[in-house]
A protein has these predicted regions:
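Envelope-exposed proteins and targeting segments
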Residues: 4, 8, 22-24, 36-38, ...
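Residues located in well-ordered beta-strands
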Residues: 9-13, 67, 79
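Short aromatic-glycine-enriched beta-strand elements
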Residues: 18-29
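Short, basic/aromatic beta-hairpin or loop at an interaction surface
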Residues: 33-45
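Short nucleic-acid-contacting surface segments enriched for D/E, G, S/T with interspersed K/R
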Residues: 49-66
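OB-fold/S1-family single-stranded nucleic acid-binding modules
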Residues: 71-94
Length: 94
């Protein structure tokens, strides 16, 4: 069971509104100034629409923060929990 969230922030490089799972690719800058792209897996498009998300809610170039469950191998990937667009409210994305 995944119970621990990490919080990451960055710039959206790609977003895929597809079924059965949506994907956000996020360029994240670390404390040393290096950057890496993280793959964030979210709910299906159908489920996201039920929660009030639409295709232009998050777009490439947007700055977002996310609370997600990092992959067990600690690579740059997460199962999304919540997304907060810059200047917006945190909403469930899974």
């Amino acid at each position: 069971m995944m119970t621990e969230y990490i919080r990451i922030s960055g710039i959206v490089t790609e977003i895929h509104w597809i079924n059965p799972h949506s994907w956000i690719f996020l360029e994240v800058t670390d404390a040393e100034g290096g950057s890496a792209v993280w793959a964030l897996e979210g709910a299906s498009v159908t489920e996201l629409r039920r929660r009030g998300w639409v295709e232009d809610s998050v777009e490439p170039g947007d700055r977002i923060s996310a609370r997600c469950h990092q992959l067990r191998d600690r690579s740059n990937g997460c199962l999304l929990g919540y997304v907060t667009p810059e200047g917006g409210e945190e909403k469930l994305f899974d």
